[in-house]
Every structure is written in structure tokens, then in C-alpha cells.
Amino acid sequence: HMRNHSGTKPFQCTQCSYSCVNKSMLNSHLKSHSNIYSTLCQDCSYATKY
């Protein structure tokens, strides 16, 4: 919690300049670099990575 107040962002993406305060946020961000879609609509072409 204190990282939010101190501005420390120790978790950094190896593919871009993104950094964040916790590993969970980094894991969510890493999905943006993949071509894997976790949600696909069966009725249209809508897809999301999250």
C-alpha cells in the first residue's frame, strides 16, 4: 500500500516503458502485448484480452 504514496513502481514491463506498483497490475498489462484473447463473443467479432 505504501508504494502508492511513495511513487515507487518496482514492477517494469520488459517490452515497453510501463511500470507499476504491484505484480498483478503488471500481469494484466502484459496481456496487451500478447495475441491471446480471453473473451470471444460467439455472436459477433468482439474479443477482449482481459
UniProtKB/Swiss-Prot annotation:
Belongs to the hunchback C2H2-type zinc-finger protein family. It comes from Psychoda cinerea. GO terms for biological process: segmentation. SUPFAM superfamilies: beta-beta-alpha zinc fingers. InterPro entries: Znf_C2H2_sf, Znf_C2H2_type. This is Protein hunchback. Gap class segmentation protein that controls development of head structures. Keywords: Developmental protein, DNA-binding, Gap protein, Metal-binding, Nucleus, Repeat, Zinc, Zinc-finger. Transmembrane segments: none annotated. One of its GO terms (molecular function) is DNA binding. Gene3D superfamilies: Classic Zinc Finger (3.30.160.60). A zinc finger (C2H2-type) spans 1-5, 11-33, 39-50. It is found in: Nucleus. Its main location: nucleus. One of its GO terms (cellular component) is nucleus.
